[in-house]
């Protein structure tokens, strides 16, 4: 999908780029698959802030996406390719032979009019979903489950893909986009292919207002704050913070490991970032 630039009639347009949405076939979503998205502004029920940098943004409705791909043995035709404001990838509306309609993530190469299938007997074709035990080693997959039947939790953002490296007993070895190699139960579902909208990572936001449309508020550095607001705050004039980087709550950051989940350590074969 090509990226367009703008004639710099304002300073922000000089650096701003955007996707050419020539792959989108309709701007009218399927209403039965829309639900209202309640916005919190980063605040909990008591009204105090729990997530910084959240708030504002354009109103959105959630599209109900089929992450389980559990409609086995029923062929579905791709009716439309649509924009989804809640994710980086495009979504495809699938019209099944029994009349039901569902949204799925659009993989690279999936076009309107194509037919897809889910289930152990499905062919190894882009958009088809199968258990990992039925997928040959070396295949590129996305939309991967961590627990059978729970629905996909990994490899769902634009341009993402994992590679099925091998199968050992009850587990399949997957090379994830982060570089991590992980064991996943062999009965978990995965979809063939790479998630679409691969040029998403090449878009330049260009201006602060475009992030505000998304509901992302400004991020201030700790050294610009007062001591009451951040451990790096205060000092006479510009300072370096005077200590190693920490979060606003005093925990070391920038490379400091905080992961503490021994229960799933056994499933990680190679950590991300390591050869």
From Swiss-Prot:
<keyword id="KW-0689">Ribosomal protein</keyword>
<dbReference type="GO" id="GO:0002181">
    <property type="term" value="P:cytoplasmic translation"/>
</dbReference>
<dbReference type="GO" id="GO:0003735">
    <property type="term" value="F:structural constituent of ribosome"/>
</dbReference>
<dbReference type="InterPro" id="IPR008991">
    <property type="entry name" value="Translation_prot_SH3-like_sf"/>
</dbReference>
<protein>
    <recommendedName>
        <fullName>Large ribosomal subunit protein uL2</fullName>
    </recommendedName>
</protein>
<dbReference type="InterPro" id="IPR022666">
    <property type="entry name" value="Ribosomal_uL2_RNA-bd_dom"/>
</dbReference>
<dbReference type="GO" id="GO:0016740">
    <property type="term" value="F:transferase activity"/>
</dbReference>
<dbReference type="InterPro" id="IPR005880">
    <property type="entry name" value="Ribosomal_uL2_bac/org-type"/>
</dbReference>
<dbReference type="InterPro" id="IPR022669">
    <property type="entry name" value="Ribosomal_uL2_C"/>
</dbReference>
<comment type="similarity">
    <text>Belongs to the universal ribosomal protein uL2 family.</text>
</comment>
<dbReference type="GO" id="GO:0015934">
    <property type="term" value="C:large ribosomal subunit"/>
</dbReference>
<keyword id="KW-0699">rRNA-binding</keyword>
<dbReference type="InterPro" id="IPR012340">
    <property type="entry name" value="NA-bd_OB-fold"/>
</dbReference>
<dbReference type="Pfam" id="PF03947">
    <property type="entry name" value="Ribosomal_L2_C"/>
</dbReference>
<dbReference type="InterPro" id="IPR014722">
    <property type="entry name" value="Rib_uL2_dom2"/>
</dbReference>
<dbReference type="InterPro" id="IPR014726">
    <property type="entry name" value="Ribosomal_uL2_dom3"/>
</dbReference>
<comment type="subunit">
    <text>Part of the 50S ribosomal subunit. Forms a bridge to the 30S subunit in the 70S ribosome.</text>
</comment>
<keyword id="KW-0694">RNA-binding</keyword>
<dbReference type="InterPro" id="IPR002171">
    <property type="entry name" value="Ribosomal_uL2"/>
</dbReference>
<dbReference type="InterPro" id="IPR022671">
    <property type="entry name" value="Ribosomal_uL2_CS"/>
</dbReference>
<feature type="region of interest" description="Disordered">
    <location>
        <begin position="212"/>
        <end position="259"/>
    </location>
</feature>
<dbReference type="GO" id="GO:0019843">
    <property type="term" value="F:rRNA binding"/>
</dbReference>
<keyword id="KW-0687">Ribonucleoprotein</keyword>
<comment type="function">
    <text>One of the primary rRNA binding proteins. Required for association of the 30S and 50S subunits to form the 70S ribosome, for tRNA binding and peptide bond formation. It has been suggested to have peptidyltransferase activity; this is somewhat controversial. Makes several contacts with the 16S rRNA in the 70S ribosome.</text>
</comment>
<dbReference type="Pfam" id="PF00181">
    <property type="entry name" value="Ribosomal_L2"/>
</dbReference>
């Amino acid at each position: 999908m090509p990226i367009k630039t703008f004639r710099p009639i304002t300073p922000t347009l000089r650096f701003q780029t955007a996707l050419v949405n020539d792959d989108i076939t309709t701007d009218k979503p399927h209403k039965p698959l829309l639900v209202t998205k309640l916005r919190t502004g980063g605040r909990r029920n008591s009204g105090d802030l729990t997530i910084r940098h959240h708030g504002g943004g354009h109103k959105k409705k959630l599209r109900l996406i089929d992450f389980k791909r559990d409609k086995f043995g029923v062929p579905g035709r791709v009716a439309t390719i649509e924009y989804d404001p809640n994710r980086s990838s495009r979504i495809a509306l699938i019209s099944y032979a029994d009349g039901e309609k569902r949204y799925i993530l659009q993989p690279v190469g999936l076009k309107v009019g194509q037919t897809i299938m889910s289930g152990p007997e499905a062919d190894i074709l882009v958009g088809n979903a199968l258990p990992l035990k039925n997928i040959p080693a070396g295949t590129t997959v996305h939309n991967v489950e961590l627990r059978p039947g729970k629905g996909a939790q990994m490899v769902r953002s634009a341009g993402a893909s994992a590679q099925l490296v091998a199968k050992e007993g009850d587990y399949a070895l997957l090379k994830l986009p982060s570089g991590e190699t992980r064991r996943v139960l062999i009965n978990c579902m995965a979809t063939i292919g790479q998630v679409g909208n691969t040029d998403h990572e090449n878009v330049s936001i260009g201006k602060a207002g475009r992030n505000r449309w998304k509901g992302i508020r400004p991020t201030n550095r700790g050294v610009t704050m007062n001591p009451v607001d951040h451990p790096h705050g205060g000092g006479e004039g510009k300072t370096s913070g005077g200590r190693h980087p920490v979060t606003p709550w005093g925990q070391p950051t920038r490379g400091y490991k905080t992961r503490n989940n021994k229960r799933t350590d056994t499933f990680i074969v190679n950590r991300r970032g390591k050869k």
